[in-house]
A protein has these predicted regions:
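Ligand-site clamp/hinge motif
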Residues: 32-78, 252, 738-769
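Aromatic-rich, solvent-exposed beta-strand/loop patch
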Residues: 23-50, 81-95, 395-399, 416, ...
Length: 854
């Protein structure tokens, strides 16, 4: 397949969504023979290469089956054509780059004094300087010269081309941002901002331009720029380019070229007040194929979510932006009446994020995932917006060996040869934070629900729901808090956990909620042999409430960063009824008029008690032992925490020392016949002891404490050799081997090309010709789209949007016409044109472009 076709395929398939039913409940049931469930392969062997080119060559030669790392265009197209023909290629726009600023103190006079007494003038504390960097960067140059065309300029975290993202991305256009930037404008604005700062009384005579660079007290003001050296063909040259641009603006740059381990530890694990860095070259994996993007607003721009400088960590200096927090929480938690209100709030938050410019996006990157075509015998499932994910290995098939075993060999990339960067902490917000380990544990986890990799629809998995049991009823705000009013009566005997008294209390009469839903739990078993049941859900809700609530200064069962993510969601829960049949019914303030499945998602409980936003899940036995290690102490005397705090040791269920302490704590819990306070009414001491013993047996056998519930379990970790084995889990996983491959098969469209007139006139019709294909996901074999495809273009102007249907010309060819009468109403200039294709009522394939009117 040619380079051009691969790039087009990547961009357009990212938006190829279609409507799918929630068939998660139709997996293997009672009577399914042992061995019929789980993944297609029996084992996965995961190793690491320190060079992407070597890993790619090993995949070509069959030394490994899948290179589970998204290569950029320069590496992939550096392979000879003969080698590429031996590969099954999955090109996905799943990567992106951004620049994170440390804006401390984020207020005039922009000077920060560290604990050592050293004073720094931070130019990135000036909002106008940060904002001007958007024009200092030539994004098109970065894509063309560094990514070799394998990506697109980006201004937001929303992947260009995916449904709904153009609404966010057009804000940058309205602000005047362009892919080429405007170096002259940027330098002028940075200079003006620094001149204004120099006139402040506190900086008078201290801040001045001396020769090429600005100085403070006679020393150059400096941006401490951490640049990822272990991405030598990507973020390293990109970082050096931006450093050169900053120096053109008179700001000296200290180029701190570090690998991912050191960089990540300094940027995300150290208090920004230490002033060890002020700018960082971030790289992101998409994390999921998305239908709704409010979570990205929270994650990438809102301080409450814990991804902005300071990480919402108690005791750290934290960037604050209350208006973004308010808008982001409102959308993320479903506190709105209409889809119009949802979009208005999100777009306002996006605009604030762009103008605050604490995190600046520069490009999306097409990642090329590859598999050996001879060894891997099928096209496995992958995320149209995030590439290889938790569904890839479960649906991949390989040729059996001489013993009849199917062993899949997968390779990761690490410049330093290490598989893991972050601690394996399944409770704290910082655990499992690197994409490498996330990719691995995702194969081992059956989450409560998932966003489908091909449609992004919220779909039941461990927890099941029927849309007939999902109801919403809301009215306008009557209290002045800006939130809708719930109109559903919550039963008086519904309960919530009270952390102060350590009891479950009835909510009483008069409580209302937006929505209610009933859920059942899929019949399944943890990897340690404990059955997953209602007690798992009761425990996790109690734990989340307890650790998110500070009951006095001496409360050790509280962690600020953890609370910052869980508290807003917990506040939406108005009450829950734990039903005698093992199901549960929740009453909650979450409204989503656009999608009823999303309403069901909003009321979910989960056995996952911590590590929000990560593809992890462990049973209550592990979580309780972790909690007691933190609050009671460890046998070794180590002081543990569920956060990255340099003064303590972060929990790590793969670290031998931490595992030893967890075993000691579990044995202590056995001796005491300990029953967690959250489930004291749902469990007898003997049942708790039996659960602890099963967990201990798993840890003893496999040497780690990542007990989960997915289609694979981690059967071996060799941190010295950077080698892992995942083994098929069949006894307690409820879905048949071939279930997911059939479930995800989907006929979708993709827009291959949009021919927009180069010299459109306002006194003549504008004719747009579109080339559209169709294919059955996850296959890459396309054919011209037939007449059942519905195609349209939407012209976006300052006055709004107007859609124009495209007529079917022949298979693969469609034509839309924008009448001259409509164009005559517009002023000369450039207008965004969004092309869409679909088969039915599903979200469309989307391709944005520009119509220039003369």
């Amino acid at each position: 397949m040619s380079r051009k076709v691969l790039i087009i395929l990547a961009i357009v398939t990212a938006a190829a969504f279609a409507l799918a039913g929630c068939g998660g409940g139709a997996g293997a049931g009672a009577g399914v023979a042992k061995g019929d469930t789980g993944p297609l392969v029996d084992k996965i062997i995961i190793d690491v290469r320190m060079d992407q080119s070597i890993a790619a060559k090993d995949t070509v030669e069959g030394k490994t089956d899948i290179f589970a790392y998204g290569m950029d265009a320069s590496v992939f197209f550096g392979l000879p054509q003969a080698d590429r023909e031996k590969l099954s290629v999955y090109p996905v726009p799943s990567g992106s780059w951004s620049y994170l600023m440390n804006p401390i103190p984020n207020q005039a006079p922009y000077v920060w004094k560290t604990k050592t007494g050293k004073e720094y003038f931070n130019p990135l504390a000036i909002r106008e300087v940060r904002y001007a960097i958007n024009w200092l960067i030539d994004r098109k140059k970065m894509v063309d010269e560094i990514l070799l065309g394998g990506g697109e300029p980006a201004f937001t975290s929303m992947t260009p081309g995916q449904p709904g993202t153009y609404r966010y991305n057009i804000i940058a256009t309205k602000l005047g941002m362009t892919e080429r930037g405007d170096e002259k404008r940027a330098i002028a604005e940075i200079t003006a901002a620094l001149e204004a700062a120099a006139k402040l009384p506190e900086n008078s005579g201290k801040l001045r331009k001396t020769g090429q660079f600005w100085t403070y007290k006679g020393e150059p003001i400096v941006v401490k720029f951490i640049i990822r050296v272990d991405d030598p063909q990507g973020r390293l040259p990109a970082g050096r380019y931006v450093a050169d641009q900053l120096e053109k603006a008179g700001i000296k740059v200290e180029r701190l070229e570090y690998d991912r381990s050191k960089a990540g530890r300094m940027v995300y694990g150290v208090d920004p007040a230490a002033y060890e860095w002020t700018m960082y070259t971030e790289g992101w994996g998409a994390g999921a194929t998305r239908r709704w993007w409010d979570v990205s607003i929270s994650q990438m721009y809102a301080p409450y979510y814990g991804y902005m400088p300071g990480g919402a960590t108690e005791g750290f200096w934290n960037y604050k932006q209350d208006e973004i927090d308010k808008l982001a929480m409102k959308s993320y938690n479903g506190w709105f009446l209409t889809d119009e209100e949802y979009w208005n709030d999100n777009l306002k938050a996006q605009e604030l994020g762009l103008t605050e410019a604490v995190r600046i996006w520069v490009c999306s990157q097409i990642d090329y995932f590859i598999a050996n075509k001879d060894r891997v015998t099928n096209r496995f499932v992958y995320g149209l917006g995030d590439g290889l994910n938790g569904w890839s290995f479960i649906t991949a098939d390989v040729k059996p060996n001489d013993k009849g075993e199917k062993i899949l060999r997968a390779t990761q990339f690490s410049a330093k040869g290490g598989l893991f960067m972050s601690a394996w902490d399944p409770v704290g917000v910082d655990g499992f934070s690197d994409t490498y380990v996330s990719m691995i544990v995702e194969q081992c986890t059956m989450r409560e629900y998932f966003e489908a990799p091909n449609t992004a629809i919220d779909t039941p998995y461990l927890v099941q729901w029927d849309l007939k049991d999902v109801q919403s009823n809301v009215g306008p705000d009557t209290t002045g808090d800006g939130k809708p009013e719930g109109l559903i009566d919550v039963p008086a005997d519904a309960v919530k956990y009270d952390s102060a008294t350590k009891t479950w209390k009835k909510v009483g009469s008069g409580v209302k909620s937006y929505s209610t839903a009933k859920y059942t739990v899929k019949d399944s078993v943890w990897h340690d042999g404990n059955k997953i049941g209602l007690a798992d859900f009761v425990y996790s809700l109690g734990f989340q409430t307890d650790w998110s609530t500070k009951d006095g200064d001496a409360d050790l069962a509280y962690e600020e960063a953890y609370a910052s993510q869980y508290q807003p969601t917990l506040e939406t829960l108005k009450g829950v009824i734990f039903n005698k049949d093992g199901s549960f019914t929740t009453y909650y303030d979450f409204n989503w008029p656009m999608d009823k499945n999303r309403v069901a998602y909003g009321g979910l409980l989960s056995p996952k008690a911590g590590n929000p936003g990560r593809p992890t899940m462990v049973p209550w036995t592990i979580t309780e032992a972790i909690g007691l290690l933190v609050t009671e102490g460890a046998a070794s005397g180590t002081v543990y925490a569920i956060t990255e705090d340099p003064s303590m040791t972060q929990i790590d269920v793969a670290s031998p020392a931490c595992v030893a302490d967890l075993k000691a704590k579990l044995n202590e819990m056995v001796e005491k016949k300990h029953v967690p306070v959250y489930v004291k009414d749902h469990m007898k001491p003997a049942e708790a002891v039996d659960a602890y013993k099963k967990t201990l047996a798993f840890i003893e056998k496999y040497g780690h404490a990542y007990v989960s519930n997915g289609p694979f379990y981690i059967s071996k970790i060799d941190s010295t050799a950077n080698y892992m084995e995942l083994s098929a889990y069949r006894k307690g996983y409820p879905y048949k081997k071939d279930y997911w491959g059939k479930f995800f098969a989907l006929e979708v469209t993709q827009i291959d090309n949009v021919a927009i007139p180069a010299n459109a006139r306002r006194d003549a019709d504008a004719v747009i010709d579109l080339t559209v294909s169709q294919f059955t996901y996850p296959s890459d074999q396309t054919k011209p789209a037939d007449k059942d495809a519905k195609v349209q273009v939407t012209l976006i102007s300052q006055d709004g949007e107007k859609a124009y249907p495209a007529k079917y010309v022949k298979d693969g060819s469609f034509q839309a016409v924008i009448p001259a009468a409509d164009l005559a109403k517009l002023q000369p200039g450039s207008y965004t044109l969004v092309s869409e294709s679909k088969f039915a009522d599903e979200a469309p394939s989307v391709k944005p472009g520009n119509l220039v009117l003369f």
